[in-house]
Amino acid sequence: MKVQRIEVENKPYPLYLLLDKEYQLIEPVMKFIKYLDNTGKSPNTIKAYCYHLKLLYEFMEQRGVILNDINFELLADFVGWLRYPSASNVIDLQSKKAIREETTVNTILNVVMSFLDYLSRLGEFKSIDVFKQAKGRNFKGFLHHVNKGRYQKNVLKLRVKKKQIRTLRSKEVKQIIDACHTKRDKLILMLMYEGGLRIGEVLSLRLEDIVTWDNQIHLTPRDVNVNEAYIKLRKERTIHVSKELMSLYTDYLIYEYSEELEHDYVFISLKEGYFGKPLKYQSVLDLVRRIVKRTGIEFTSHMLRHTHATQLIREGWDVAFVQKRLGHAHVQTTLNTYVHLSDQDMKNEFNKYLERKEHKK
């Protein structure tokens, strides 16, 4: 199985297809990819979907079944196989550790179910019922009084343990920024920390997106990005940043950027032989690895975004404002992800309560 990138005539961005071991196009996946593209999914999302479906077809090949053989039992086996890949139908749970976390397995399962649902709507696959009525929904929708709190739950999805999102202390952030050797690297990490930007959003920035005089950054979705960095959800938004960050941006343009480029991407490679080319996703991942090695601080790029959001909430920002700043589609995502209290948060709030109580005496 192979995921193949292709250039399509009249499309300014690449698409991805799935090929079998004979390098023949897998037609059901091709139809699904076309549907995803027509409904506005980003090239990166389509690429991820292709790789997830590649796993399904590898599983089917190993089991000696075809798509129309897929039933509830095989889907359940597929979920187990994702965690414990095995050449046989027997899984030795005693000697193996799951290679994928529950959240990853659930993400892959969601893609597979969307794929099968699409084929079912075309009349090319028999629908599989994997849902049951459940209670206990966190968020009450507009029609909650009609549904009486019941919703559809996928019984194949794995239970995910609620994890405390790890954030960085201010001292650690300073060490990380100080460990950068270039203004470009400092600016990239500061945009994630102070602006809450994702890697794709940072790398998609063009010179016209940054308004230095008003300390604003416009995040603008574009169909064509040669470095394949895209804004998630394809929604525009504007964030405000500090004068200090804008000053760092200006210094980067003066001392490290080139005026002789044929493009206007903000972040470029500074390596000899590659100088001036738009920076790619892997380069930022490599940067983070270097900083981890230099500082001994274990962190990810997304942890900088987590830290920013958590600090905003601790400072009293309304969750709706945090949602808009981070670019979440739903406020519930912000609530579920960032409204978490550490033991220290609880202690601080209790001490404030005691102070107010003492003041009233």
Swiss-Prot record:
InterPro entries assigned: CB (IPR044068), DNA_brk_join_enz (IPR011010), INT_tnpA_C_Tn554 (IPR042721), Integrase-like_cat_sf (IPR013762), Integrase_catalytic (IPR002104), Integrase_recombinase_N (IPR010998), Integrase_SAM-like_N (IPR004107), Tyrosine_recombinase_XerCD (IPR050090)
PROSITE patterns, per the entry: CB, TYR_RECOMBINASE
Residue ranges occupied by any Core-binding (CB) domain in the UniProt entry: 23-120
Active site: R198, K232, H302, R305, H328, Y338 (o-(3'-phospho-dna)-tyrosine intermediate)
Function: One of three proteins encoded by transposon Tn554 required for its transposition.
Organism (species): Staphylococcus aureus (strain Mu50 / ATCC 700699)
Family in the record: Belongs to the 'phage' integrase family.
Keyword Transcription regulation: no
Domain Tyr recombinase: 163-351
GO BP of this protein: DNA integration; DNA recombination
Pfam families per UniProt: Phage_int_SAM_1, Phage_integrase
Gene3D superfamilies per the UniProt record, alphabetical: 1.10.150.130, Intergrase catalytic core
Record's keyword terms, sorted: DNA integration, DNA recombination, DNA-binding, Transposable element
Domain of life: Bacteria
Protein name (database record): Transposase A from transposon Tn554
GO molecular function: DNA binding
